[in-house]
Each structure stands twice: as C-alpha cells, then as structure tokens.
Amino acid sequence: MRVLVSNDDGVDAPGIQVLAEALRHAGHEVMVVAPDRDRSGASNSLTLDVPIRTRRIDAQTCAVAGTPTDCVHLALTGMLDYDPDIVVSGINNSANLGDDVIYSGTVSAAMEGRFLGLPAVAVSLVTHNHQAHNYDTAARAAVEIVARLKADPLPADTILNVNVPDLAWSDVLGFEVTRLGNRHRSEPCVPQRDPRGHTVYWIGPAGPEQDAGAGTDFHAVRTGHISITPIHVDLTRYQALDTVAGWVGGLTAALDGPA
C-alpha cells in the first residue's frame, strides 16, 4: 500500500523514522510529510493566515512549516503526485490516552486523513518522562494493524487510536480493544519571570487518571497491553437533545420580545 506517514513531534523525531522504516520493510511505499519542528498539542489547527512553506529532504520525506493537520491536508489535496491509500501518524513520544486525543497533533493528523477519505491510524508510545526505549514495539504493532485494516476495512468514519506500553515486543501481554478513559482537570499553569521582569506562563501537566478502570485505554496500557480504541468525530451529546429541545419554545418566544 501507499502509506502517508506524519506526526506532531517533527520530521526528525526518532519515532517517525522508526515507523517509516518498519512500514517500508513490510513492503509498503511510504511518504513522510511531517512538521519541520515539534508541534505537539496542535490539535486540528490549520494554518490559514500565512502561506505554508515546505522543504523536500529527500524523495520520500517532506518537512512542512505547519501543523500536523496542515501536513496531511496538503499531502492529500494536491501536493503529492499520487494518492496514498492510508494515513499512519506517529510514533508519538508520549501517551495519547483518554482526553489527550482532543489536543493531540498525532491523533489530529490521522483524523485529517479520515476527513479526507482515507483509513487512518494514530500510534503513540506510552513513555515515562518522554524517555522512549521501544519504538520498535510500537512500529511492529502499527505494521500488524495496517495489515488487518487492509484485509478487513473499518467503516469510513473510524480512526484507530493505538497506545503501546514502552516494553519489548516479547514483554507485551497482548492487544485490547478499549474505550477512551478520562483524566481529572489539568494541573495549574506554571508562572515564571522572563529576563525583563514580565510574568510568562507554561501550560501545566495533564491531569491524573480519573476514569481509568478495566475496559479503558489507560487500564490496558498500565497492565502491559497494546490499546486499540476505535474513535470517530461526532461531538453531538445525544442525551441532551431532548432537554435542549424543551427550551426551543421559550427561545422562539424571545424572538418576539423587544430588541
């Protein structure tokens, strides 16, 4: 298959290089289109206020001065001279568990691929303090999952979010299909003083696990399993539709009131 590979850690990150090489070794034609620097936390943002510059590193690698979503969007809307068959994003150098997927550039790159009509997988290595040791395990998991997707495709609105414990392949206990867990609210932001005496802020750490019991992605990884979570983008809160519908009469009446 023709595989488009992207990430949010940047085109030079070790995770994307290991992933691309593993996919090539499995017989796939791989094109890497990734940010020219770390764009972690970029979520689904597109660059609309300035033109986006690109730089060909070699015939199979392109660096983009933009977000992960920019990378996939450009690659699938005319920048390449062929159409890929699948998007694989990663390997991220940290977890994308539970609420993380809302902010994750790794997941968003896969999501953009799905929006533009391709099957998509996001792969993350759940490291401690961003010190990764087993990218090869995550890459092997990605290769196996891509093979299954080719043989048994998923519905067109589905993205696979894969989280891999930082273990040797022989130490992984298995694969688990999971749902997204949840974290507590984020830790406080971190204020500092710059050299001119002005207060600046760093975003604080993600909150600790909250909904992380059996069946969640958190639990699977914590117990030595590779978590596969099928996700889709429909933010409708169906349970609230009837309640909000009950407001409509009053809201409509307000239209007849004084301006």
Curated annotation (Swiss-Prot):
Role of this protein: Nucleotidase that shows phosphatase activity on nucleoside 5'-monophosphates.
Gene Ontology CC entries for this record: cytoplasm
Keyword check for Ribosomal protein: no
Required cofactor names: a divalent metal cation
Species name: Xanthomonas axonopodis pv. citri (strain 306)
Residues given in the record as a divalent metal cation binding sites: D8, D9, S40, N92
This protein's name: 5'-nucleotidase SurE
Reactions catalysed, as given in the entry: a ribonucleoside 5'-phosphate + H2O = a ribonucleoside + phosphate
Coiled-coil regions listed in the entry: none
Gene Ontology MF term list: 3'-nucleotidase activity; 5'-nucleotidase activity; exopolyphosphatase activity; metal ion binding; nucleotide binding
Cofactor note: Binds 1 divalent metal cation per subunit.
HAMAP family in UniProt: SurE
Keywords: Cytoplasm, Hydrolase, Metal-binding, Nucleotide-binding
Subcellular location: Cytoplasm
EC number: 3.1.3.5
Cross-referenced InterPro entries: SurE (IPR030048), SurE-like_Pase/nucleotidase (IPR002828), SurE-like_sf (IPR036523)
The family this protein is said to belong to: Belongs to the SurE nucleotidase family.
NCBIfam families: PRK00346.1-3, PRK00346.1-4, surE
Enzyme class: hydrolase
